[in-house]
């Protein structure tokens, strides 16, 4: 039995996205007074007393989209309604019953799943009585809530759970999914890629740049591996960020990178890299995320152009990420899409790898023998030992006589050596140089300690 789905529907600006965030207890959807902010279906998993359901946020019914995507938005809403086990019909107590509310109810005619009429913005108890006029709609159990004043959240959750399909004893929490952030400039094919992965029209795909405004999570499975793909808003030059939505989108893309286990950095095979690409790659590096450079739309490139040309170009543009794998795909047809995801799973495994202190020091000793550190103030700095202290990213602490004596170039050399000889070949490695403690120094003077180059 699949995880039950609960869809949030209603006219624009009744607080659907606020309700979504409130029930999820975290800010996932963009909340703004501008009509039509939500276009794609957003989902999150909710748990209550061992009962799981997937909550779906949808666009406002009846809004005319400024980018001529109205029919696509409607299709996304219809798909959410069709897949839902329970429907939350959201109305606004403060504005009262509107003709568009009645149109929404008309759209639900013939839908046989349970409907819960959620009267939002009842910020004070005395406003609850104003919700009675919505009973004229004749659909579902009526409950008043306020997302801003945190009124009746638990009651609403219980009403939802009571109307879910009878629980299957075999239904367990979905296994932890590997999170993949899909980032890049606008219109490079990120949403098409997600649709290919999910094998459904999950995202609105259009030639209108900036179609995806939220970061949207899509769960799917490949060869027994569960993934959670996060499709992010496309970024553009900072001086071009003209609206609050673009500001939110930039923030969403950055947060998606922070959430991710692996990042897929998308490029358009027909366009050169830009300042935006470099800023985004810099953000990925800053957060030490494993990354695959994905060159999309490869089918549109002249067949005589070798992939090596793009490889050389990207290596030149992003010299500090020379270890990052590069993939060439056609998201629209699915060419190499599965291979990219399998490679992402390999990177995730590398980032989770842990090596013993003995093996790490054996590798480090070989690096020092091959290339000892340079003299510093008349002395050669000593490296005593190293230990891996964490994963994701693999993090190594090197105990030495003086961290200042080991230059950044030498530290990069050690990282490169570890990458070549340990199971961290294609992922970032964090390296910390730390001065030995007084007790360790005393042990060395007494003959009980030794450096790796001894």
Swiss-Prot record:
GTP 2 binds at residues 184-191, 231-235, 296-299. SUPFAM superfamilies: P-loop containing nucleoside triphosphate hydrolases. Residues 4-168, 178-352 form the EngA-type G domain. Pfam families: KH_dom-like, MMR_HSR1. GO terms for biological process: ribosome biogenesis. Associates with the 50S ribosomal subunit. This is GTPase Der.
